[in-house]
UniProtKB/Swiss-Prot annotation:
PANTHER family: FINGER PUTATIVE TRANSCRIPTION FACTOR FAMILY-RELATED, ZINC FINGER PROTEIN 628. The gene is Znf250. GO terms for cellular component: nucleus. This is Zinc finger protein 250. It holds the Pfam family KRAB. It is found in: Nucleus. It comes from Mus musculus. Keywords: DNA-binding, Isopeptide bond, Metal-binding, Nucleus, Repeat, Transcription, Transcription regulation, Ubl conjugation, Zinc, Zinc-finger. There is a cross-link at K99, K200, K396 (Glycyl lysine isopeptide (Lys-Gly) (interchain with G-Cter in SUMO2)).
Length: 535
């Protein structure tokens, strides 16, 4: 006896499942109605479905739609083009009956789509397309049963119910009246119906998050308990979910079954291949609702959204510093451990971050691949180009919350904030002098070492600071880039221009503590103070 509200189907002999039995072909119009995220989901589901069917060892040539997906083409078909693919699904009752009598092989078919993906489909245009296709092309075996009265649930038990598009490998007598999907157990149907109702009766008592299935709640609880029951026999690494362990095993076996047809790169997971293919297609389906910025992966979007929320869930156990991205925390922890796993093959210099090593390689090659579109200046690092471009745009996105002063680079803001906090974390090992910026410490240490690494190619004179060399070079070139707006006089140094402008403004910021006399230059005040010392 079926449970109330559940509609049993007549038992059917077990049949082989082919890709054609489960494929959903889309027309050009239907494909156009899907958004980027839904197209990505469709690609993922179709490729995974085909992979599961192929794993059963069933014969058959590769479907056209799979070839289209592998080539990165839009997987829609012209009207009538999918007839061959769909004819086995739309046969009449006699053809269905003959097929069922001839095909009684017992196959254990794996699930073609996960519960999460199925839940996502119900909330998307892709589900709507499937529902419309289902309504117009039921693909059922007509029944001669007469129409009888409706039951208490508004259903007529005598009316033939459309079978789902998938040909079940086992008896599935319970059908969903919303979408026509069939199930072997009434409990599975009840779980499925929560997709349509939105009911989530299983609530986590720790964080309050709700789920439609108790099994999903059980997996979620392991986040709070830290339980990882699935352990790798090779290396002992443990996982919360069995599917994660299965994927991890491929690291040891070296298996990479999913290959990119564009560049030949292979991946252990289909999802990684799909993500990689967006590099070639330029697709960025994950859009931030706050600023509109788009990303090619959902995890990158989640990390980005923390910029808006200020959330920093990853904390360092050593110093308590928090980070919005786990990768940044791992890089930071190397400050405490001193680990520098990335070594330059040219000079042997080691780095704590791989991206810094890649940038360092440009020092040896001389490569400067990043060019400014405004002035043509080239840079070895993309981040340096971005900072440079703000000179042209005059953008200063990093503002101090204390005084409102804005900066071009985030590192400059960090250094500036130490003016307010008084923090000077960089200490000289020779004399104990402390500095707020690491660059200032490096420059100071040259006083003790006598190092002057910046040499003039014209006269051979050397300097401890690069900025001093740049100013010196203007002696040879005669360049005077700093011009007074009041009188037009030009200067080779910005500091000299500032001093000169005080002639026009009358500003005298340097005052003598003895007699109160003021001067427009600090050097003039020093000379004046010697008068008091002589007296």
């Amino acid at each position: 006896m079926a449970a109330a509200g559940l509609l049993p189907l007549p038992a059917a002999p077990q049949a082989k499942v082919t890709f054609e039995d489960v494929a959903v072909l889309l027309s050009q119009e239907e494909w156009a109605r899907l958004g980027p995220a839904q197209r990505g989901l469709y690609r993922h589901v179709m490729m995974e479905t085909y992979g599961n069917v192929v794993s059963l060892g069933l014969p058959g040539s590769k479907p056209v739609v799979i070839s289209q997906l592998e080539r990165g083409e839009d997987p829609w078909v012209l009207d009538g083009q999918g007839t061959e693919l769909s004819q086995s699904l739309g046969s009449d009752h006699s053809e269905c009956k003959a097929k069922e009598e001839n095909q009684n092989t017992d196959l254990n078919v794996p699930p073609l789509i996960s519960d999460e993906a199925s839940a996502t489909l119900t909330e998307t245009p892709l589900r709507k397309v499937a529902e419309e296709r289902y309504k117009t092309e039921p693909k059922v075996c007509p029944s001669p049963k007469p129409i009888g009265p409706q039951n208490a649930h508004g259903l007529n038990p005598s009316v033939p119910v459309a079978r789902p598009q998938t040909a079940p490998s086992v008896e599935r007598p319970y059908i969903c009246i919303e979408c026509g999907k069939c199930f072997g157990r009434s409990s599975h149907l009840l779980q499925h119906q929560r997709i349509h109702t939105g009911e989530k009766p299983y609530v986590c008592h720790v964080c309050g998050k709700a789920f439609s299935q108790s099994s999903v709640l059980s997996k979620h609880r392991r986040i709070h308990t830290g339980e990882k029951p699935y352990e790798c026999n090779e290396c002992g690494k443990a996982f919360r979910v069995s599917s994660d362990l299965a994927q991890h095993h491929k690291i040891h076996t070296g298996e990479k079954p999913h290959e990119c047809l564009e560049c030949g790169k292979a991946f252990t997971q289909l999802s990684h291949l799909i993500q990689h293919q967006r590099i070639h297609t330029g697709e960025r389906p994950y859009v931030c609702p706050l600023c509109g910025k788009a990303f090619n992966h959902s995890t990158v979007l989640r990390s980005h959204q923390r910029v808006h929320t200020g959330e920093k869930p990853h904390g360092c156990s050593e110093c308590g510093k928090t980070f919005s991205v786990k990768r940044t925390l791992l890089q930071h922890q190397r400050v405490h451990t001193g680990e520098k796993p990335y070594t330059c093959s040219e000079c042997g210099k080691a780095f704590s971050d791989r991206s810094v090593l890649i940038q360092h390689h440009n020092v040896h090659t001389g490569e400067k691949p990043y060019e400014c579109s405004e002035c043509g200046k080239t840079f070895s690092h993309r981040s340096t180009l971005m900072n440079h471009e703000r000179i042209h745009t005059q953008e200063k996105p990093y503002a101090c919350y204390e005084c409102g002063k804005a900066f071009v680079q985030h590192s400059h803001l960090i250094q500036h904030q130490r003016v307010h906090t008084g923090e000077k974390p960089y200490v000289c090992g020779e004399c104990g002098h402390a500095f707020s910026a690491r660059r200032s410490l490096i420059q100071h240490e040259r006083i003790h070492t006598g190092e002057k690494p910046f040499q003039c190619t014209e006269c051979g004179k050397a300097f401890s600071l690069k900025a001093t060399l740049i100013v010196h070079l203007r002696t040879h070139t005669g360049e005077k880039p700093y011009e007074c707006n009041s009188c037009g006089k030009a200067f080779s140094q910005y500091s000299v221009l500032i001093q000169h402008q005080r002639i026009h403004t009358g500003e005298k910021p340097y005052e003598c503590g003895e007699c109160g006399r003021a001067f427009n230059q600090h050097g003039h005040l020093i000379q004046h103070q010697k008068v008091h010392k002589k007296l």
